[in-house]
Regions:
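Polytopic alpha-helical membrane-helix bundles and their juxtamembrane interface segments
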Residues: 2-30, 81-82, 92-204
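Long, highly hydrophobic alpha-helical transmembrane signal-anchor segments
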Residues: 23-54
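Residues that define the loop-to-transmembrane-helix transition and helix capping
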Residues: 34, 57, 170-171
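Hydrophobic alpha-helical membrane segments of integral membrane proteins
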Residues: 38-42, 58-62, 151-155, 174-175
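Interfacial loop at the N-terminal end of multi-pass membrane proteins
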Residues: 54, 70, 85-91
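Alpha-helical transmembrane segments
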Residues: 54-70
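Membrane-water interface at transmembrane helix exits
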Residues: 58, 74, 78, 114-118
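Membrane-water interface of transmembrane alpha-helices
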Residues: 65-83, 192
Length: 204
């Protein structure tokens, strides 16, 4: 049972700031707006600190070692595709073969990372590792505007919102990720509509 009075008393301004930055970041992504990457930088840095304080080592490393440079890379890729903020990089899908390859790459990555984290005293090492591995895949596919990246974010947001963050008593972030779960579903539907016809499949 959640003690909401205690949760509000222990509310971290840092966690609130991270949640706001992340919410804006994802909303802009749903709208296919290039400024998603700027807010992504703020979100990554703030949540990196939040996860570090909570001893979620895989998630901390994910923020600083992968997400942060990927924000710069994603920004560059989208800018290169077109000069305006509503850029011209097309929304596409993975080929069936590429989907299999990415799945086969993601699951062993999660298993290996979970095994390594089990020696570090990390909290929730296996689920943290799974979230990290799926996030790595999702972020790369997002950078290249592959519709399948929304499936990754649906899974990640569900694992964070229903399992990982509540167990660390990060209630604001838990609520945020449940909201992000809804936004990910909306983003998936919006991008499917925006993709248009005929649909294209390009390997990555």
């Amino acid at each position: 049972m959640i003690d909401w009075q205690r949760a509000l008393h222990e509310l971290s301004p840092l966690e609130v700031a991270a949640a706001i930055a992340t919410l804006v970041n994802v909303w802009l992504l749903v709208r296919n707006n290039i400024w998603t990457w700027a807010w992504g930088v703020a979100s990554v840095v703030l949540y990196g600190i939040v996860f570090w304080r909570s001893k979620l080592w895989s998630s901390t490393g994910l923020q600083f070692l992968y997400y942060l440079p990927m924000q710069a890379y994603g920004w560059w890729v989208w800018l290169r595709a077109g000069p305006t903020h509503h850029d011209d990089l097309p929304i596409t899908r993975l080929t069936p073969r590429s989907r299999v390859v990415w799945t086969l790459a993601t699951l062993p990555m999660a298993a290996l990372l979970g095994w390594l984290m089990s020696f570090t005293g990390a909290q929730q090492s296996m689920i943290d590792a799974l979230v990290t591995a799926v996030s790595v895949t999702g972020q790369y596919l997002q950078t290249h505007k592959k519709i399948e990246h929304w499936f990754c974010w649906v899974a990640v947001n569900a694992m964070y919102g229903f399992w990982l963050l509540p167990r660390q008593q990060l209630w604001v972030s838990s609520a945020l990720y449940l909201l992000l779960l809804g936004l990910a579903i909306k983003g998936w539907r919006d991008w499917l509509r925006e993709e248009g016809a005929p649909q294209r499949s390009i390997a990555v």
